[in-house]
Amino acid sequence: HAYHHLAYLEPDSGALFAGDVAGIRLPGQSYVRPPTPPPEIDVDAWIKSINHIRRITPASLYPTHFGCYDDVERHLGELEQRLQDWLLFVEERMDGGAGSEEIADELKDKGDAEMLAEGADTEETRHYDLAGNYEMLTIGIMRYVERRRKTA
């Protein structure tokens, strides 16, 4: 997620206190949202961290936002897929000349549709937005894309 974040495994229970690397998920929901605020999102490192979590096979995940989840592989798979999908989505719109506000509006439409498809209601989409709003998430992804392009 970011170079300064850590995760802690409790060996007796197998619980991984994963922080933001495990995404945003509200209790009672299956939907996992990647928290991508600026300034230090690193998608490549994040995916490596997700794969590292898979290798240590925790029994449960405790993301910063919120709760405890036992469906570790499903959770991580959805997070990784959505992270890569959102990165491509934002990058394509940047290439088309869209600015951060336009991209954030489009990402909100996309993200809300994804949540509703997984059974959330409009009130729950608002709760997810409180945990990580699209304007902030979009700016984080855009900064990552710009930084990656400068070093390519």
Predicted regions and their residues:
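Glycine-rich beta-alpha junction loops
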Residues: 1, 67-68, 111
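Catalytic core of the metallo-beta-lactamase
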Residues: 1-29
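Amphipathic, non-membrane alpha-helical segments in soluble helical-bundle scaffolds
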Residues: 19, 43, 73-76, 80, ...
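Surface-exposed cleft-lining segments at the edges of enzyme active sites
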Residues: 31-40
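Conserved phosphate-coordination/catalytic loops
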Residues: 40-44, 135
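Divalent-metal (often Zn2+) His-rich catalytic cores of metallo-beta-lactamase-fold enzymes
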Residues: 45-100
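C-terminal regulatory/interaction regions
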Residues: 92-152
